[in-house]
């Protein structure tokens, strides 16, 4: 009898826990994805803050030349970063217990792997939590689909690219100047600016900014005034009101006359789908581009210069880009390589005559 009561009590305790986890009445929805998201993101955030402030220099290139990234070792907010895991570790899973000591783990950049792997798991769970909450509320699933774009971009630079290049040391450093360094080296080695998928990403980000500004300004300019001239127009809106808050016909008429009639949406649902889809698809393509360049399927290169009938080079923009790429390539990891890869891979000229 006692055992039966205990089992019922434990079952009801588990049931209450399940109800609490999946309740949409909580101030912040937790959900089953949140059960994994909360500890992983807390771990990533905590280790990032500690490492950004106090981590010792990391031997990123595996050549016994540690690079300082933390504030206590001479950096500021701009130059500071979590230095990627050493090339000596490569793609090996490198938790603390795999190192001989904590000092060795820090020297080889263990915190970078810890932060990145927990972060990626956390943001993937955040995406799942968005879907889960939408499902509980009877909403459509497109919020999570839109969030998949930045998740794909993060996975591309923190996981797919290191896998393709063979080492976590090639991942993006976790800092401002480290991000710019990653971009410059990426351009030098993969000519990303000449990759069509990156071009689509640029169109997505800049186009999305333009469309967002256009939409916000059009709506704000065509509000239906419910207040006097002495009050803010914003005070005329009541949360949850059934009436339209702006005149879409006026906005459509304005924009149709500013550009031409069919450049303006007359369907609010089509408009908002477009506003969501444009940047999301662009960022999807950029993430796909990074993931293919990870395996050295690079952007267009025009290594053969245009020459005239006399064999003289006619300089084009491609020649300028090639020269810039070589300059950036010889300057990065300058003590790890004697020559940039583009020069070192060329067959040596014959000396036999």
Swiss-Prot record:
[CaMn4O5] cluster binds at residues 170, 189, 332-333, 342, 344. The record marks 344-345 as: Cleavage. Keywords: Acetylation, Calcium, Chlorophyll, Chloroplast, Chromophore, Electron transport, Herbicide resistance, Iron, Magnesium, Manganese, Membrane, Metal-binding, Oxidoreductase, Phosphoprotein, Photosynthesis, Photosystem II, Plastid, Thylakoid, Transmembrane, Transmembrane helix, Transport. Residues 345-353 form a propeptide. One of its GO terms (cellular component) is chloroplast thylakoid membrane. A quinone binds at residues 215, 264-265. The chain crosses the membrane at residues 29-46, 118-133, 142-156, 197-218, 274-288. Pheophytin a binds at residue 126. PROSITE patterns: REACTION_CENTER (PS00244). Chlorophyll a PD1 binds at residue 198. It catalyses: 2 a plastoquinone + 4 hnu + 2 H2O = 2 a plastoquinol + O2. The record marks 161 as: Tyrosine radical intermediate. Photosystem II (PSII) is a light-driven water:plastoquinone oxidoreductase that uses light energy to abstract electrons from H(2)O, generating O(2) and a proton gradient subsequently used for ATP formation. It consists of a core antenna complex that captures photons, and an electron transfer chain that converts photonic excitation into a charge separation. The D1/D2 (PsbA/PsbD) reaction center heterodimer binds P680, the primary electron donor of PSII as well as several subsequent electron acceptors. 2 of the reaction center chlorophylls (ChlD1 and ChlD2) are entirely coordinated by water. Herbicides such as atrazine, BNT, diuron or ioxynil bind in the Q(B) binding site and block subsequent electron transfer. PSII is composed of 1 copy each of membrane proteins PsbA, PsbB, PsbC, PsbD, PsbE, PsbF, PsbH, PsbI, PsbJ, PsbK, PsbL, PsbM, PsbT, PsbX, PsbY, PsbZ, Psb30/Ycf12, at least 3 peripheral proteins of the oxygen-evolving complex and a large number of cofactors. It forms dimeric complexes. This is Photosystem II protein D1. It comes from Adiantum capillus-veneris.
């Amino acid at each position: 009898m006692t055992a039966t009561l205990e089992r019922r009590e434990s079952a009801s305790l588990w049931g209450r826990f399940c109800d609490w986890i999946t309740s949409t009445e909580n101030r912040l929805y937790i959900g089953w994805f949140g059960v994994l998201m909360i500890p992983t993101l807390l771990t990533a955030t905590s280790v990032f803050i500690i490492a950004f402030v106090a981590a010792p220099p990391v031997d990123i290139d595996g050549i016994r030349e540690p690079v300082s990234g933390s504030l206590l070792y001479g950096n500021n907010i701009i130059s500071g970063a979590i230095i990627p895991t050493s090339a000596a570790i490569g793609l090996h899973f490198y938790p603390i217990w795999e190192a001989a000591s904590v000092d060795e783990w820090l020297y080889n950049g263990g915190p970078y792997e810890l932060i990145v792997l927990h972060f990626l798991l956390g943001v993937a769970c955040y995406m799942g939590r968005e879907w889960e909450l939408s499902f509980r509320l009877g909403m459509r699933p497109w919020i999570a689909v839109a969030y998949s774009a930045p998740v794909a971009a993060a996975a591309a630079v923190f996981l797919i690219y290191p896998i393709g290049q063979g080492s976590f040391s090639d991942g993006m450093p976790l800092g401002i100047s480290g991000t710019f360094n990653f971009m410059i080296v990426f351009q030098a080695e993969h000519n990303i600016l000449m990759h069509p998928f990156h071009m689509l990403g640029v169109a997505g980000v800049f186009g999305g900014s333009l469309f967002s500004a256009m939409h916000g300004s059009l709506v704000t300019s065509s509000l239906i005034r419910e207040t006097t001239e002495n009050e803010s127009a914003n005070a005329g809106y009541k949360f949850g009101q059934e009436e339209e808050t702006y005149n879409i016909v006026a906005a459509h008429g304005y924009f149709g006359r500013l550009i031409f009639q069919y450049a303006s949406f007359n369907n609010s649902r089509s408009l908002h789908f477009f506003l969501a889809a444009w940047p999301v698809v662009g960022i999807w393509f950029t993430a796909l581009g990074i993931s293919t360049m990870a395996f050295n399927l690079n952007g267009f290169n025009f290594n053969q210069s245009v020459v005239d009938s006399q064999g003289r080079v006619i300089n084009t923009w491609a020649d300028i880009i090639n020269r810039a790429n070589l300059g950036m390539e010889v300057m990065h990891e300058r003590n790890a390589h004697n020559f940039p890869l583009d020069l070192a891979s060329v067959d040596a000229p014959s000396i036999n005559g």
